[in-house]
């Protein structure tokens, strides 16, 4: 089940203006925090001055910004990839120091090499990283670096640095940082409007942040049993690959990569004993899924990519390559070819969720819903709370026109996972399929609007749902109560711009 099946939200040019909603509500700051930064001068690491913003306030800004990202960026809602990236991220977080907030990891459908962290423990990764990171440790090195930015509160520190030189409100300071993170070109334009002295201070601050994030990131990699050499290796390969490029990757504008930084990271990594880290089958499968469905590569070219690697691959690597080719076959409705590739895979690993998910797509494509439901029910007996399996099961019920069964499952799911837009999208579809639950359909869609910070639309939907519900019913009372919550959330969201 891919993002396409789950109504993946792609930001249009008009909706991208929402990405500046906090930076629009927030953006009068002339100084960008993380752009074109190549030199250094930072306050002592142990004396991080963060009086400008509390951890609680960081969480508020992080929640607001995440809602805007959902509205403006092509977030990958693929349950398998979300499970993988969050599992990997939380393995790193469990081995990090100074963790003050829960972490959330998200994937953006963008082939550019980039990653960024923002307030509230959010770390965003571009799907293009999977195309360039050859091992899980290399991907983990980027994530560990971003986690360090969060644990060391580099955004809050940068705001403190700006506050010492610019008479700006907290909201405006946040706006300049958010603008630089989400749209480096806009951040650069803002930076050019600043005075030379302010810009130099910001440049100095950022380079030291990068050095600190590298140092702490390598420590986290080591504690989490990853290959610490992966960080300098990945940096070095990127630098070599783009040495003579006319246009540098976006990653370099937000993460400057001078030779000294590569040398320093290599020296730090050498302080740890060498370790042979086995190939991660899950990383290989996640990478194959990215290539097949989120790489921007034409189907024929993606198939060629898999076939070229298949010739020299180990037996373990061939599994992930066959899986990727099977996904291409399913998406092209070559169901017989897909079955030939998938059958031996799922026979060897019947509980592998990558293979279960692919077989579900195949069965749905052939309208063999009972086969898919039987396999999913068996898998759920072993893993009753797994979100990938639950969403696949609900999706299959919707496609099989068993809307009432899907509603029963999805009402529980959305209660447990209210921030998962996949659950609300499927619940909306399930209500719609019955033709008798227009109020529920409107409410589910309203939750999707709320997750994107589109409060007026969410309130409109819930108002209509309350009007459709039976007068005095429990459903109407529930809708009215949710309306009150949404109005309070909208007021808090708006209040961020007034600080």
Q: What residues fall within each predicted segment?
A:
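Short pre-active-site segment immediately N-terminal to the catalytic Zn-binding motif
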Residues: 127-141
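Membrane-active amphipathic alpha-helices enriched in small hydrophobic residues
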Residues: 167-182, 189-201
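Surface-exposed patches in mature extracellular/periplasmic domains of secreted proteins
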Residues: 72-82, 95-105, 159-162, 186-189, ...
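Extracytoplasmic and endomembrane cell-envelope/extracellular-matrix remodeling and assembly machinery
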Residues: 33, 44-52, 63, 75, ...
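Hydrophobic or amphipathic, alpha-helical segments that drive membrane association/targeting
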Residues: 2-6, 13-19, 26-116, 241-243, ...
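Catalytic Zn2+-binding segment of zinc metalloproteases
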Residues: 137, 147-164
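Active-site recognition of the HExxH zinc-binding catalytic motif
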Residues: 125, 141-149, 153, 213
């Amino acid at each position: 089940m891919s993002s396409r099946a789950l109504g993946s939200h792609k930001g249009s040019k008009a909706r991208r203006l929402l990405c500046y909603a906090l930076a629009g509500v927030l953006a009068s700051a002339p100084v960008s925090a993380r752009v074109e930064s190549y030199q250094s001068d930072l306050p002592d690491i142990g004396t991080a001055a963060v009086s400008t913003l509390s951890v609680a306030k960081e969480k508020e800004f992080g929640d607001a910004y995440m809602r805007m990202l959902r509205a403006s960026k092509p977030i990958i809602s693929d349950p398998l990839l979300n499970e993988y990236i969050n599992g990997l991220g939380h393995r790193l977080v469990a081995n990090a120091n100074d963790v003050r907030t829960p972490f959330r990891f998200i994937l953006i459908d963008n082939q550019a090499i980039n990653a960024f962290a923002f307030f509230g423990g959010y770390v965003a990764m571009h799907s293009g990283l999977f195309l360039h990171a050859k091992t899980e440790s290399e991907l983990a090195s980027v994530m560990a670096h971003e986690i360090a930015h969060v644990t060391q509160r580099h955004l809050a520190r940068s705001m403190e640095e700006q506050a010492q030189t610019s008479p700006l409100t907290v909201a405006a300071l946040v706006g300049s940082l958010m603008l630089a993170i989400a749209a480096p070109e806009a951040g650069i334009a803002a930076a050019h409007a600043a005075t030379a002295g302010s810009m130099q201070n910001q440049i100095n601050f950022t380079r030291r942040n990068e050095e600190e994030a590298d140092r702490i990131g390598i420590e986290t990699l080591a504690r989490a049993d990853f290959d610490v050499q992966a960080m300098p290796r990945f940096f070095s390969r990127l630098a070599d690959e783009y040495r003579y490029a006319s246009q540098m990757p976006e990653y370099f504008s937000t993460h400057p990569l001078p030779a000294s930084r590569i040398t320093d990271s290599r020296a730090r990594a050498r302080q740890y004993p060498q370790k042979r880290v086995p190939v991660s089958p899950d990383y290989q499968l996640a990478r194959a899924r990215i290539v097949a469905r989120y790489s921007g590569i034409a189907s024929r070219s993606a198939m060629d990519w898999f076939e070229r690697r298949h010739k020299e691959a180990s037996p373990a690597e061939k599994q992930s390559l066959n899986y990727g080719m099977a996904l291409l076959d399913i998406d092209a409705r070559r169901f017989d070819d897909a079955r030939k590739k998938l059958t031996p895979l799922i026979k060897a690993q019947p509980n592998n969720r990558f293979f279960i998910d692919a077989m579900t797509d195949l069965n749905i494509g052939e309208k063999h819903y009972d086969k898919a439901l039987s396999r999913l029910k068996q898998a759920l007996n072993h893993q009753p709370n797994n979100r990938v399996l639950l969403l696949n099961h609900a999706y299959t019920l919707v496609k099989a026109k068993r809307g009432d069964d899907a509603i029963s499952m999805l009402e529980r799911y959305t209660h447990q996972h209210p921030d998962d837009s996949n659950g609300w999208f499927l619940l909306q579809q399930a209500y719609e399929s019955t033709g008798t639950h227009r109020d529920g359909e409107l409410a589910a869609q309203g939750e999707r609007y709320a997750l994107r910070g589109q409060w007026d639309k969410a309130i409109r939907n819930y108002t209509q749902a309350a009007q459709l519900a039976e007068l005095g019913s429990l459903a109407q009372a529930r809708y009215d109560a949710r309306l009150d919550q949404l109005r309070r959330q909208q007021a808090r969201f708006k209040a961020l711009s007034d600080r």
